[in-house]
Amino acid sequence: MPRSVNHVASRARRKKILGLTKGYFGARKNVWTVAKNTWEKGLTYAYRDRKNKKRNFRALWIQRINAAARLEGMSYSKLMGALHKAGIEINRKVLADLAMNHPEAFKAIVAKAKAA
């Protein structure tokens, strides 16, 4: 009995990957093995960078809060300690947004933290 090969599924699978690598440079877009490896590596980078994104944004928020806090005569760590002591539960993302876009509101929060 001859060997059974599902050419339709194989071709569809390869076409799918080559479609996903459309727009890549050189052999990465049209040579099956190179395209497959590039696509898989891209998935790895995407997974890694979804984790790094959280780290990077937290660091950015801390830098922004620190810069704004120093304008008010406090360091970041002193401000966060004072906020905790004052019972002000506000996350770093919102605090950084206030520091950048609403400095008067940030000043009010810092004043309340200093008073506590």
From Swiss-Prot:
GO cellular component, one term: ribosome
Gene Ontology terms for molecular function: rRNA binding; structural constituent of ribosome
Pfam families according to UniProt: Ribosomal_L20 (PF00453)
Gene3D superfamilies: 6.10.160.10, Ribosomal protein L20 (1.10.1900.20)
BP GO terms, sorted: ribosomal large subunit assembly; translation
Keywords: Ribonucleoprotein, Ribosomal protein, RNA-binding, rRNA-binding
Family designation: Belongs to the bacterial ribosomal protein bL20 family.
Protein role: Binds directly to 23S ribosomal RNA and is necessary for the in vitro assembly process of the 50S ribosomal subunit. It is not involved in the protein synthesizing functions of that subunit.
UniProt cross-references to HAMAP family, sorted A to Z: Ribosomal_bL20 (MF_00382)
Protein name: Large ribosomal subunit protein bL20
Native source organism of the sequence: Phocaeicola vulgatus (strain ATCC 8482 / DSM 1447 / JCM 5826 / CCUG 4940 / NBRC 14291 / NCTC 11154) (Bacteroides vulgatus)
Phylogenetic placement of the source organism: Bacteria, Pseudomonadati, Bacteroidota, Bacteroidia, Bacteroidales
